[in-house]
Amino acid sequence: MKAERGRIMVIGKKEQRNPRQEQCAQVSMLCRQRLLGYAESFEELGKSFCEEVGIVGDDRQSILEKYMLQQSRQIMGDHLQTVARIMERVAGEELVYLPLEEKKRKSLTQAFGSEGIQARELCYVRKKSIPGGISMTLSTERSGCKASQAADMLTVLLGKRLQPSPGSPYLIEKEPHCFLFTEEPGYVALTGVSRALKEGEKISGDQYTMLESERGRLILLLSDGTGAGEDAGRGSGRVLDLMEKMLEAGFDTEASVNMLNSALYAQNEEGDHPTVDICSLDLYTGECEICKVGGVATFIKGRSGTEYIGGDSLPLGIFQKAQTERSIRTLKPGEMLVMMTDGVLDALEDDCEERMRNRIDMLEEQNPQEIAEKILSYAICSCGGRIRDDMTVFVLYLWENA
């Protein structure tokens, strides 16, 4: 497997590079070389699993068993190759350290010191596909000192609106920790959720969650378990838990969905086929990636009207490869996205997508919670107040970061 070797660059005046920076560069290069070695091993192992073997047998049962084994080998091989590609990507990322100007470094160090915070190893960080920022090691004897307070200080001192990255510690403590402060995105997303349980049930089979990535993306996840009640809720909850872990580990949306689908397909549990809807919003550009596996239509209300996307794919675990509907849209301030489970649309019965589109188009509210509640109320009223399935409405409204 051919791969471009990863690089680390430390830019600045030669005299500003201290032995610690040189050592960090050498360690990083060694780690990258090891990652590429591991990636090559995983790639070759994956290829060995994917090699096709002639299927022969004396009876129908033995042929079927060998065919199922061949499918399992193919799934395993695909996953190993996916892991190899992620290792390659991480190893190939270019990380740039740019030491702060001496005058600015002293100014920041003194300012933090006056607040009882020790700041060391200050430098600019540049990394492809991740917002640039400032990295520093912070510690304090104070209790309850939040990283957001340090971000506020940097905002005032540097004249740039900064925030702690999602991966940075929440508190500054006695023990020194590394913090990364990145520029605030140009957009702010507000969300609202409204839910209703199926009649006679105490637990919803619908589950939702949100997470923020290091790359400045807000990710919304919505899953509808098979049926309703506790078992359905357990299934959809497991889907979101695994999706969240894979996305946080660095898998992209498509790889995460395929690996999750393969796991459910391999379990071969009849009747357990949850759906998953994913909305990944770039808070710097407004680009919104919508990925749907079995979920009903997602609605986007823009300045020119309301459109609906998808709703034709099958749930997870039915086929060896997930049937994914993927769309890209760019949201602008004042526009909103509405995700929902099938219990909401099914309540509208005939021509449900068009009826829901018209209803959303008529809404004038800007509060996402109010919007979610109005949509849910409309669905419940449309079915005469009888809730025959779990209902969840998930609304995202985009604002400019003033």
How should these model regions be labeled?
Residues 99-132, 149-151, 155-176, 184, ...:
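Catalytic core of PPM/PP2C metal-dependent serine/threonine phosphatase domains
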Residues 130-133, 186-188, 213-219, 333-336, ...:
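Short hydrophobic/glycine-rich mini-motifs in sensory/regulatory modules
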Residues 227-249, 313, 335-385, 402:
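Active-site-proximal, acidic helix/loop segment immediately C-terminal to a metal-coordinating Asp/Glu
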